Curated annotation (Swiss-Prot):
Pfam families: NAD_synthase. Deamido-NAD(+) binds at R140, K173, D180, H260, K261. HAMAP family: NadE_ammonia_dep. Belongs to the NAD synthetase family. ATP binds at G46, I47, S48, G49, G50, Q51, D52, S53, T160, K189, T211. This is NH(3)-dependent NAD(+) synthetase. GO terms for cellular component: cytoplasm. Keywords: ATP-binding, Ligase, Magnesium, Metal-binding, NAD, Nucleotide-binding. It comes from Streptococcus pyogenes serotype M5 (strain Manfredo). Catalyzes the ATP-dependent amidation of deamido-NAD to form NAD. Uses ammonia as a nitrogen source. One of its GO terms (biological process) is NAD biosynthetic process. Its EC number is 6.3.1.5. Homodimer. Mg(2+) binds at D52, E165.
Amino acid sequence: MTLQEEIIRQLGVKASIDPKEEIRKTVDFLKAYLRKHSFLKTYVLGISGGQDSTLAGKLAQMAIAELREETGDQAYQFIAVRLPYGVQADEADAQKALAFIAPDQTLTINIKAAVDGQVEALQAAGVEISDFNKGNIKARQRMISQYAIAGQMAGAVIGTDHAAENITGFFTKFGDGGADILPLFRLNKRQGKALLKVLGADAALYEKVPTADLEDQKPGLADEVALGVTYQDIDDYLEGKLISKVAQATIEKWWHKGQHKRHLPITIFDDFWK
């Protein structure tokens, strides 16, 4: 088995999908998890205005609405959370995503004071934080807020990790990589886009340039620039297609580099890192 085949196997990616089937499968999965865990009544998810959180949020709201109708239990709720750092440049996209999702509840927590306070505390201790690491603090602070909300609201936190993100390790460890349930796992970027099209999302929500937008000094830095490879190449690779040797080498480099993010903290019994 080639490395490409092994990665595809691990991430469960299909070469082609039926978007309607995947929508139904995901909604049923989200419903089943809450039914199995009777102490949970809500899903919590940060909404950025990008493709991934828009899709995960819409599917979560659909699942919650169906659960309420099927059980008569009005305690089932989907809580969308806006988590800007100061003023978000593409706030209009976030509001467009919220209008599409139509969440039961929307909370807004501005993380700027918490992030800046942490950076200042570190500086006071003599630790200077790079702009890149400050970006990771932002991602982790967003999860702190989401887990606080989930803890108070009998909730589970939804993550937006999907195959094209997982293969590159393009997420912050214990930040956006920390979640309870991953409804988009197995889908690549273009497949997620296909689901949004079927769901009737505004094209602007899935055609915009993907960006983590974590660094102050590189606002709106495109994912593809940061990774040095296009999502088209990543998606083709995940669908078992041939791509250029340069693109393949870049993708596989990120796969190896990000292995630690796909595992629980390393113990003496682990050998994947050797």
